Each structure stands twice: as structure tokens, then as C-alpha cells.
């Protein structure tokens, strides 16, 4: 059954484009960790092709190797043939998901998260309200004091320790409407993609994004009908649900009639920018998706174009930057975040060795593959500590939580702060 599903889902021409040169191997975190050919992009593509050609039957080892992939796409920029590995691994996971039998509790968690929570923003706000109550009412302190969290896996305990303050309301409630006018002359009509998790766990970052855009001359439009971007769905094999979400977002932002669509999360932005590929076989939505994808920008691209750093406050601290994999490898945004950080008056920018290597967050990878994620994080934190930076900056919520967990794990709390680039820029640009 899996073989037939793979044959139906996989883009065979792209499989054949792999030249087996091996340039992807030094860029691949799982290959570098294990040294196994099967744990490299080249190896995984060879496995996909072998199954599609009928040379081998897909077994548990095949599925395990596909699931071990971070989906960081570090292999794509170094591939001379331009093989879209990210699309191939998502197609493979979609095929696996069609036939795989999960334990009942895994089915329940997946159904709850992917179909009943993430796609429904009102429910996400309700969940945020409950988390906020847990954090502020004294329940969290009591739970920690009584040691209740000891029953949870280590990675869950670490995440609870660094969980940001949740919000039960979104940016529309905060700003009192869906249109935030530009300060001064309007340069762009910018659609703000607020994200499902961002507006609950990183609401302050979203508010800062709106303020920075407005002060940079953007009229900010928050499309009310927008939903989750679908990235976690696509990465987990639920591509049909990702397509459903994509159609809703395309419709919402076309209705808003915006010039650009701004994301402040690398993972979301990369997904949004590839809606044209996701909906390529949908005749009704194909052109609409191209319209949408062509307008998606990361917040750093917009700010690098519009802001005047010499008006910023001085920040006499050492700063280093951990690049978001999907921002770098998916959206191809590399220079703008660094140029903004280097422009902060008084700050010393320190290049992070292998700052382009995945931190191990990779969506929910750190929860489902904790051993590999932990190994990558430990290596990353050794490199971070070597910079002696006061601030570790990133541009994606998952990376930010992973960096906070790494700081906690490495005993660097009080010595180093992990911060989203938007929050740092909002700090230095306050008048």
C-alpha cells in the first residue's frame, strides 16, 4: 500500500534529477550526526526512488529515515541540480501518513492539534487564555513546587520552563481594529500574517511587528479570515489539510487587496511563499496562489528597505544571530536580518560559527525526535557560548523557544538573552 501511495505522490522527475554528487551531505545535520548514507538527502532520495522503481519494499527502517529528517532544507542551496528536496520529503510523508497506523493516543493528539486547534484561531485564543490563567493564577508555581512536572518527558519539562506568557487575545483586539494606519506617507498596504501560535504565545512580537511596519510607512491590514499557514500539517504528512488552509489564506488576503504580505516567522513565511507549489494542481486556485506567493515578504526584508537605523537608540552589547532554516533555505532571506543587526548603534555583532546549521527545533521535531534534537542543540549551544554574546537573536518562534531551552540547559541564564529580531528592533527604535 505504501509503495502505491509513494508512486502516486512523488514527483518522479525530481527524484531522477538527483546526480548523487554528495554535495548535500556536509550540509545535512542528520548525516553529520550519524554518518549514515540513508540519513542524508542523497540517501533518502535513493530510498524513495528504489521504492518507486519497485527495487525495494518500504519497511519500518524506510519510514524511520524519512521521519528522522529535520526538513531544514540545508541541502537545497548546495544542490547543483536544484532538486526541491523539501517538496519530496513532504510528498513522502504524505504517502506514509495515508497508510500508517498510529497508536490511538497519537491519532487523538494529531486530530486535536491538526484539525481542531491550529486551524481555528478562536480556539487558539481560548487555549491561550487557559495557559495565561495557569501562568498567572499561581497554579504554575504550585505545579512546579509539588514536582508534578516530573512525570513529563525531559523535553516537555524544558519547554514548560521557558514558555512565554500566553495571550487570550490577538492583535486585532489590541489595536482595536483590522486597519492600522501608516505613520506619515503610506508606502505599502501591508497584510500582516499573524500566525496561529504567534498570536497566542508571541503576541508581543506581533504587536511590535505592527508598530514597526506602521512607523516605517506601511498601512497594516490584519485579514480577519486568515488561518494557520499549514506548515506543521505539511511537514507531518497532512498536505491535504495544508491545502485547505492555503485556500482560506489566499482568499482572505486577496479580499484585503494588499501590496505585500508580511510574516515574522521564518517557518510560516516559507510555507506561505510556496502556496503556488502546494496548489499547483488546483486549476481554480493556481493563479490566485501565485498572486499570493509573489507578495510574501519576511519582516526583515521590509524593514531593511524602509527604516533608518541612525535614528535608533544605542545598545552597547554583543549580539549573535542564529538563522532560521526556513527563512534562509526556503525564503532565501540571509542578508537583511544581519544588516539590520549590524546597523544597531553601539552593538557589536559576532558571527556565530555554523549559524546556518539547524538548532534542532524544526517545527515539532524537538518533541517527536528529542534525542537528535537535543544532540543538535547541545552542539549549537557550545558554538553560541563561544561568541560570549549578551543576546542570541533569531527570527522564528520555534527557533526562539529552542534557543531559550538551550540557554536554560547550558546554564547561561542571566548571562545571555534569546530574543526575536522584531522585539530587539522594537526595543532600539522606541522614541
PLM-predicted stretches and their roles:
Residues 2-15, 55-66, 181, 214-217, ...:
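Short, intrinsically disordered, charge-biased short linear motifs at domain edges
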Residues 11-15, 44, 62, 72, ...:
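Short runs of predominantly hydrophobic/aromatic residues within well-ordered alpha helices
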Residues 12-31, 59, 63-83, 326, ...:
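Cysteine-centered iron-sulfur cluster-binding motifs in ferredoxin-type domains/subunits
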Residues 16, 35-39, 57, 233-240:
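Alpha-helix capping and helix-loop boundary segments enriched in small/acidic/polar residues
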Residues 23-26, 36-41, 219-222:
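N-terminal glycine-rich anion-binding loops that anchor highly charged ligand groups
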Residues 85-431:
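Iron-sulfur cluster-binding electron-transfer modules in prokaryotic oxidoreductases
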